[in-house]
Amino acid sequence: MNKVMTAREAIDLIQDNMTFAFTGFVSFGLPEDLLITLEEKFINEGSPKNLSLFYDAAPGCREAHGGNHLAHRGLIRRIHGGHLDLNRKLAALCSENAMPVFMVPQDVNTHLLRAIAGGEPGIVTKIGLKTYADPRQDGCRANQAAWDCGETEIGRAHV
């Protein structure tokens, strides 16, 4: 397999109901071409759809870039992220409860990406205890749809 591909070739690998993960902080390290290509493919072909979105930080630039390209009903079915303010269009859909949204502390997301890349099953951390991230409190649920889905992104381990 060729290690270099176009944005379209990469997006064509994404199928309906998959998890799409990307990173970037504001516009640094942001795969803008991939996000634009994903948006265009969804608008023109209706696929891929119902993606779970995973990002670690704050990928966007208020109105026009980053996660804002993914703000289309039917494209995203669930969000696990670190910050929504820089993705205003996506945040608006979240406020409308268009999908469950879980806002997990950025450092937890970063460590989780590293663990997944290393073949680990997950991470154990004290980060977020006694805050909204604590599974005994809000469990990172950021909207009513997250409560209504009956799931959470995190759990509590007894050691």
Set out the residue ranges of the language-model regions.
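Conserved alpha/beta enzyme-core scaffold
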Residues: 1-156
